[in-house]
Design a protein with these regions (language model features):
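Beta-loop motif signature
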Residues: 26-102, 130-203, 231-238
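Generic "edge-of-domain/loop-turn" microfeature
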Residues: 14, 49-51, 100, 115-117, ...
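Homeobox/homeodomain signature
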Residues: 8-9, 14, 32-35, 46, ...
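Sec-dependent N-terminal signal peptides of Gram-positive bacterial secreted proteins and lipoproteins
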Residues: 1-27
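Boundary regions of SH3-family modules and the immediately adjacent low-complexity/disordered segments
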Residues: 111-148, 207-238
Length: 238
């Protein structure tokens, strides 16, 4: 074996070692424990950054934008009921897998809550202990149900019922909309209340009193005493 052949073999071996990863799944842990927020210290790639062919998905500056949510951002949302671009709960990340490189580096496979950005980000050296490019996120905070909402309630038009408070969990979806797929006189009970950490708005979990009507989360702005809904045969909320 001449020195050129030997050198080529060593180069190939080095590349193979560099690209070696162990794929693992985190799907056996509760979804809420796998919600994270970017730190802005590392970019997002299509593969672990050290793997050949890894392409940039979101730069460090973009990840930093996802990471930041100030009181000014919350005030903007409060006045307009929408977030600035790349802001809000939709830009938390959900971890659904990871890869370990030969050096012991963890790269988490993540996706934004709205599904728009997906890829791998460096996450430290210990599986499940989020570091590097991500840190653990608490997307909602528990809050109390107001005393005057202990009786039956209804939803003003065009209130929407969600499976989660919007984008506080991955795969958020609409379950129905009042006066479209949900009757305007549908009756509910409030059983839980949370506040979204970023937007600071409150969502009530409404338990449907009829099997044909879905239970789910509704923005408090659209939840009214049932007597108000019933007396007006449904209320339109502008």
């Amino acid at each position: 074996m001449n020195k050129w052949t030997k050198s080529a073999m060593l180069s190939v071996l080095a590349v193979v070692i560099l690209l070696t990863t162990t794929s693992c799944s985190t799907s056996n842990t509760a979804g809420s424990t796998r919600n994270v927020v970017a730190t802005g210290k590392y970019a997002l790639y299509t593969k672990p950054r050290t793997v050949k062919g890894a392409k940039l998905v979101a730069s460090k500056s973009m990840m930093k934008k996802f990471a930041s949510y100030t009181q000014s951002d919350a005030d903007y949302y409060y006045g307009r009921l929408r977030n600035l671009a790349y802001k809000g709960s939709a830009y938390y990340f959900h971890v659904y897998g990871y890869k370990v490189t030969h050096t012991g580096s963890i790269y988490y496979h993540v996706v934004t809550m709205n599904g728009n950005y997906r890829g791998y980000v460096y996450g430290g050296k210990k599986v499940g202990s989020f570091a590097g490019g991500v840190k653990k996120a608490t997307t909602t905070q528990p809050t109390t149900i107001p005393a005057d909402f202990m009786n039956y309630v209804g939803i003003a038009i065009p209130g929407t019922v969600w499976n989660y408070p919007p984008y506080t969990q991955y795969k958020t979806k609409r379950l129905g909309k009042v006066n479209w797929t949900i009757p305007s006189l549908a009756k509910f009970k409030v059983t839980k209340a949370v506040k979204r950490t970023r937007e600071q708005d409150t969502y009530f979990y409404l338990k449907s009193q009829k099997s044909s009507v879905p239970s789910g989360w509704v923005n408090f702005r659209y939840v009214l005493h049932y007597s108000e809904i019933e007396g007006n045969e449904g209320i339109i909320h502008n």
